[in-house]
A protein has these predicted regions:
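Short, small-residue-enriched loops and turns at beta-alpha junctions
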Residues: 143-145, 194-196, 220-221
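Catalytic or ion-translocation cores adjacent to nucleophile or general acid/base/metal-coordination motifs
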Residues: 27-48, 188, 198-254, 263
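Actinobacteria-biased recognition of intrinsically disordered, low-complexity terminal regions
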Residues: 387-433
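Glycine/charged-rich beta-loop-alpha catalytic/anionic-binding loops adjacent to active sites
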Residues: 156-163, 206-212, 311-315
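Metallocofactor- and cofactor-centric catalytic cores in central/energy metabolism, strongly enriched
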Residues: 1-183, 187, 199-203, 323, ...
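Active-site-lining helix/loop region of Rossmann-like oxidoreductase modules
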Residues: 7-10, 210, 221-351
Length: 433
């Protein structure tokens, strides 16, 4: 067996489509790897899969063909038309590997039945393509937070509830995480949805000996905050308030126009700033849907701070970007790094991947410089496989059994050129800034 699978949950959304087009373009050497962190010199020698080693499939509840979605993104200025033309055949091949996702409104029977189908889809994909492993990445629509129930804490109780046709104990993102872990696959949550962040799912990951990472990809406004906030702290300047407004269109804007859907996103953004500056900073944050913006996203921030002798000053900044173009290369980076971690015997939360997330699992470190150092140091150590186990919140776990197969070493930054509803589908369905 050889190769790595990338299984996208929300495979026909903007982020997923951009990632697939980008992967195909990198493989064909049509574009440079701009925005791909794992192509930096610091990752030379890290045993990462090459672009040509990655095979893509996925789930989605939307049926718009991948090529059609890519055409829409090209018309929006996100994908060059020459790249679209050159990757059309590859897009059709990936589209043929996308299966129907789980939707609670259309599913009948117990959630365990849905899990069995999802697991079969993933394992059949892994087997038919002779893959060493599959990384499942959630780029589906942002979900609202869910009420806590005791089944979220205990794996045996969760499994019993999943078998009950009268209950829907897991939201779609967490059901997909459960299916991925059950299939022996690593899981990455690029959304602020509940997803992997349940104690019972942590226990399942450790029992299966697979790693997971998340949550909520950091691509725009929050990225700037994690760079700038430590500057104020290091210079002993007192931040009094940090107000932010996000303007966005497309499916992302429509999805987050619902206050319930936006709640998880706002909470994810707020946690990082509070961790960096403390709870005493006034930090109102708004997300507004502006359909005219399409795929573009604009963030306005106003920072009020106090200096020596009480001098009042402010910083204002504007960030305008194409979110899918910022997120897509990170999806490819996370696939490579998580696959390498799995091959090296890592299991449980990959806190070292905090660099990529607004609300990272397994760590409270939000300072971007420290996250960068943590990531590069950790990646270099992946050359030396070692099993790792992580304790459950309520007790000890058995040592996981690491995989025995190994990935080919990547010897140079340029080596390996060959290479639910989508985040965002607009069908744009997730959000990452």
């Amino acid at each position: 067996m050889s190769g790595t699978g990338l299984w996208l949950v929300g495979a026909r959304g903007s982020v997923a489509t951009t990632a697939v087009v980008g992967l195909l373009a990198l493989r064909a050497k049509l574009v440079e790897p701009v925005g791909c962190v794992t192509e930096r010199a610091e990752f030379t020698g890290v045993p990462l899969p090459g672009w040509e080693d990655i095979v893509v499939g996925g789930h989605d509840v939307v049926h718009t063909p991948l090529e059609k979605r890519a055409e829409q993104l090209a018309d929006a200025g996100l994908i060059p038309h020459r790249v679209l033309a050159a990757t059309a055949t590859g897009l059709r091949a990936v589209d043929a590997r996308i299966r129907d996702g789980y939707h609670p409104a259309t599913h009948t029977g117990a959630q365990a039945d849905a899990v069995a189908r999802l697991v079969e889809d993933i394992t059949a994909f892994r087997s038919s393509h002779g893959l060493d492993r599959v990384v499942v990445v959630n780029v589906s629509s942002t979900e609202p937070p869910v009420p806590h129930v005791v089944e979220h804490d205990e794996l045996d109780l969760l499994e019993a509830a999943l078998a009950d046709p009268a209950r829907a104990v897991l939201p779609p993102s967490s059901l997909m995480a459960y299916a991925a872990l059950s299939a022996g696959c690593a899981f990455v949550d690029f959304t602020p949805s509940p997803g992997i962040r349940l104690p019972a799912l942590h226990a399942l990951a450790v029992a299966k000996g697979v790693p997971y990472a998340g949550s909520d990809g950091k691509t725009g406004e929050t990225l700037l905050r994690t760079v700038l906030a430590p500057m104020f702290t290091a210079r002993a300047l007192r931040v009094r308030s940090w107000a932010g407004t996000n303007l966005l269109g497309g499916g992302d804007g429509a999805n987050l126009a619902d206050p319930a859907q936006a709640r998880g996103k706002l909470e994810s953004k707020a946690r990082g700033l509070a961790a960096l500056l403390g709870e005493g900073v006034t930090a109102p944050l708004h997300i507004d849907n502006v359909p005219d913006l399409g795929e573009q996203k604009t963030a306005w921030d106003h920072v009020s701070f106090e200096g020596f002798l009480g001098a009042r000053m402010s910083l204002q900044l504007t960030w305008t970007g194409l979110d899918s173009a910022l997120a897509a290369p990170l999806i490819l980076d996370l696939t490579r790094l998580t696959a390498a971690a799995h091959a090296a015997g890592r299991s449980g939360p990959l806190s070292e991947l905090a660099f990529f997330f607004k609300d990272p699992v397994g760590t409270d470190e939000h300072r971007f410089a420290q996250q960068t150092e943590l990531l590069t140091d950790w990646a270099r150590n992946l050359s030396h496989p070692q099993p790792a186990s992580y304790p459950q919140p309520t007790g000890d776990n058995p040592e996981p059994t690491p995989p025995t197969d190994r990935m080919a070493r990547r010897d140079a930054p340029g080596n390996g050129w060959g290479l639910h509803r989508g985040r965002a589908s607009d069908e744009r369905s997730g959000s990452s800034s």
